[in-house]
Amino acid sequence: MLDEMANRLHMVKGVASAAHPSRLDASVPSPFATELIALLPRLRRFARSLTGSADRADDLVQAACERALRAADRFEPGTRLDAWLFRIIRNLWIDGLRAHGQDPSRHLPIEAAEAVPNADGPARIEATLTLAKVRAAIAELPEQHREVIVLVCIEGLSYRDTAEVLDVPIGTVMSRLARARAKLAEALGTTPDQMLGDR
């Protein structure tokens, strides 16, 4: 799937280049495209946390990559490409929901747990069941809490980068994260101290 997305990205770059040759041939440096391709698994994971669907997530990531490639000349070197792309994905998702008359704040599920790598036999089954419980608990969180958990605890963004992606103050990120951890801890029968780590 990721190879297919990388091929799509190369195709998108070619199509965008043909549409705007003066902007993209010179302005989309190879390192930009290379880093963008390397981020595809993380972008897809974030998009899936928003959409609840692998197919819709792939469409969202493709649209975000197209937009990023068209705007590559506006990307500021030295800033985090991942945070910029997460923000593009989130904004496209919200715009899409609004275009279809849906409320972006409504609950959208996260897909069922994927297989757990590097585990076998009973350990794999237990880890997969635990992952399924965690994903189900995350899916039950309000959207604002789910976004913060995914960006900070799963994608590894700092509070500052998460605040930038979500366009909220850092204090809001911290309070949403604390509430999300408390709700997850309650749902999983543990304490917030044992929840996912900080960045």
In which residue ranges do the predicted regions lie?
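Short, charged helix-capping/linker segments at alpha-helix termini
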Residues: L24-T34, R44-A63, A71-P77
